Amino acid sequence: MSSDAPERFDPETGIAAEVETARIEREMEQSYIDYAMSVIAGRALPDARDGLKPVHRRILYAMHQSGISARSAHRKSSSIVGETMGDYHPHGDSAIYNALARMAQDFSMRNPLVDGQGNFGSVDGDPPAAMRYTEARMSPIAEELLDNIEMDTVEFTANYDDRLSEPAVLPAAFPNLLVNGSSGIAVGMSTNIPPHNLGEVIDATIHLIHHPECTVEDLMNHVQGPDFPTGANIVGQNAIYKAYKTGRGRVRVRAEFDVQDDRIVITELPFQTNKARLVERIADNVNAGTIEGIRDLRDESDRDGIRVVVELKRGANPDIVKNQLLEHHLESTFGVINLALVDGQPQVLTLKETLHEYLEHRRTVVRRRSQYELDEKRDRAHILEGRLRALEQVDDVVDIIRNSTDRDNAKAALRGEHVVESDERGESLPTFDFSEDQANHIVAMQLGSLTSLESDEIEDEYESVQERIERLQTILNNPDELDAVVEDELATIRDKYADERRTRIIEDDGTVTHEDLIAQEDVVVVVTEDDYIKRMSLEDFRSQHRGGKGIIGTSLKDGDTVSSVYVANTHDYLLYFTSHGQVYQLKTYQIPEMSRTARGKSAVNLLELDDGEQITAVVNTAEMDIDDDEERYFTMVTQSGYIKRTSVNSFQNIRSTGIIAISLGADDKLIDVEVTDGNRDIILGTRKGMAIRFNEGDVRSVGRSARGVHGIKLEDTDAVAALAAVDDDQDDWVLTVTEHGYGKRTDIDRYRQQSRNGKGLIDIKTNERNGHVCEVETVGISDELFMMSRKGQILRTPVDDISTVGRNTMGVIVMDLEDTDTVASVDTHPRTDDSSEADSGDGESESENATATTPS
């Protein structure tokens, strides 16, 4: 202490030398506030940016500093706790170990941040084993929270004894606050944030990047609701909406169970429910007579999952027992309090605000990382420039170094601080003005680096460094480029770690459903051969005149091609018929909405498809908007020419695993499906340009498992390409499109009705120019066409832009394709107001040879 500093205590008496009078109420108030803020900011609440409390952040950083990564061996938990406590968190070891254990529990964390080995507790409330017995390391996804932390991406502060530094926040490559949630009790406030699905949260974050003005309702198109690690069900969408809209709410969580005749089997419990205590409470209620109708209760849970069996008494009503269990045990309430630290202050956040805080943090991280890398690259470019200059005058540089008295003298000479008058041959040597860093590197160069090969490598590296500098400057100077980097990195995390939802959202009377929050709009849905699927707004595609090239509609992975395109409303139910003869159902809005350049999402994440099973036909149930007394049928055709008709009533209860729609022969597959009313004419078109028209009454209605009857006689090398149903009130023409992009309209009357199983008539010429037929549709004057190529181009064009000609003709160019591309799919849709006038596109004139031989 300085000698002139005032003495606070009398050295003889120990009494304070100065006494300050204060009101005890004010002092207690201020001291309490200081204590409260210390607890709030330093212990109980997570940071909105990385979703971590200080203890969790310090544990992960201590593991990072000790090299305990996802690829290293597990380390004793006691060692991790000791390093955390000694270097960063001077609190009790039990508190640190409890925090470590929670990050390893897959029933507490949606995406565990610690990979534990040993007993870290259970859903029965068992405590973790002592820290000397368990081992741990970081999980792979935890490493993403610390990625690039060495690149000045976040602020560091001194640790508790000023001996080390620790991060104030982690870079956090994914929105951990929402993904893993958080809970804690501070002074006068608490937080309780539920976990969410990683893929949904990232999709919402990306949506916010592109639509900063979006609403909570818009974001809920991506984030359905909390996604608990223990699964179970959330009852009602309204409570979720309120919690996301205000930051506070109460969500009802219901166990998953199967009600059978003589038992109820519980397989999933509400989040944070102690299973052992639950079973005990049920037994107590049965003994007390609160719950009646139960004769036995068994916990058959094992490492494969939860299974609690409630055996019912003979004659007991399973629904009554179920309702009693729901009232007392199987349904709980999760109180959402989305409270987190924003700029060090506690704040209740809406869903949008939570994502915004994270997004701003990631922008800062990417900006700081880019600046850090830019500085490094500039330093490296400076060194390389010096080395290249030295190599250009290598003889003079070598002479200067050789004639210098020592290394420092040589460096000084290279910096131009003095002149080496002459070398051993008596010649004057030039002067240089290298910087200090350049001179140091030049003097340190080995003789082997003077070779021409080494010079080429330096030039290549210099060019590469300059390119990277330009890219980094673009990122730093262009907010859109910076956001693109943030989006790409988020998408990478999603593709690497996202999995399916575990918690289902079930509806309740009087609630706002998830569907209510989704705007009704027409969309374009694309499916690929590898069963990638996505939807895009119809407004993304402007109408062009025929002969245009269209615009990109999807990106494709290597080896994949487009299989089908169709237009639907977001609220439509779609039935997906597959190559195995199965049918599945899905709401259009459940298909992920993506950009035109995105690849899509694997359909196996939406439909439980078998290996090798492909979507071959899609039926929109909006086409079945009929009176109750009207019958409708699904009329199906296979590539070998079999046709069948089955009542739509047979498809009312479609399971998530699908149901059979048609039995198929060997090497046969379902090609097309149409909705008919029992009185329609059917047109079958083949790949080689034949077509047959007959009444659907020629095909009797059969069950789902039937194979059907022959619809057309095919040549040995021919196959059915499409099925069209004639609507006399709306359809005027038959539209035929070939794989090389040619097509035509022909009056329906030119296709005379025949008997089923005939050879048919020539519909279109399938020569080298046209290629094979890929689609046959019945169309009206108000329709427009959506054509998609195998490589992902989409053309939207009016049907009346296509010439009306006879049957046995060549047709005109409809879509201009690359030489290696072909038409994959065609769909028709009633023309909308925004498509009434087509763009000129790249359309060709009508002077092509639209007619050829006279129809036979």
Curated annotation (Swiss-Prot):
Motif stretch (GyrA-box): 544-550
Annotated GO CC locations: chromosome; cytoplasm; DNA topoisomerase type II (double strand cut, ATP-hydrolyzing) complex
GO molecular function: ATP binding; DNA binding; DNA topoisomerase type II (double strand cut, ATP-hydrolyzing) activity
Keywords: ATP-binding, Cytoplasm, DNA-binding, Isomerase, Nucleotide-binding, Topoisomerase
BP GO terms, sorted: DNA topological change; DNA-templated DNA replication
Enzyme's top EC category: isomerase
Biased composition, class Acidic residues, residue ranges: 835-847
Region (Disordered): 822-856
Active site: 133 (o-(5'-phospho-dna)-tyrosine intermediate)
Subcellular location: Cytoplasm
Pfam families in UniProt: DNA_gyraseA_C (PF03989), DNA_topoisoIV (PF00521)
Listed EC numbers: 5.6.2.2
Family matches, as InterPro entries: GyrA, GyrA/parC_rep, Gyrase/topoIV_suA_C, Topo_IIA-like_dom_sf, Topo_IIA_A/C_ab, Topo_IIA_A_a_sf, Topo_IIA_dom_A, Type_II_DNA_Topoisomerases
Major localisation: cytoplasm
Domain Topo IIA-type catalytic: 45-517
SMART domains reported in the protein's UniProt record: TOP4c
Catalytic reactions of this protein: ATP-dependent breakage, passage and rejoining of double-stranded DNA
Residue spans crossing the bilayer: none
Subunit structure: Heterotetramer, composed of two GyrA and two GyrB chains. In the heterotetramer, GyrA contains the active site tyrosine that forms a transient covalent intermediate with DNA, while GyrB binds cofactors and catalyzes ATP hydrolysis.
More about this protein: Few gyrases are as efficient as E.coli at forming negative supercoils. Not all organisms have 2 type II topoisomerases; in organisms with a single type II topoisomerase this enzyme also has to decatenate newly replicated chromosomes.
Function summary: A type II topoisomerase that negatively supercoils closed circular double-stranded (ds) DNA in an ATP-dependent manner to modulate DNA topology and maintain chromosomes in an underwound state. Negative supercoiling favors strand separation, and DNA replication, transcription, recombination and repair, all of which involve strand separation. Also able to catalyze the interconversion of other topological isomers of dsDNA rings, including catenanes and knotted rings. Type II topoisomerases break and join 2 DNA strands simultaneously in an ATP-dependent manner.
Family: Belongs to the type II topoisomerase GyrA/ParC subunit family.
Name of the featured protein: DNA gyrase subunit A
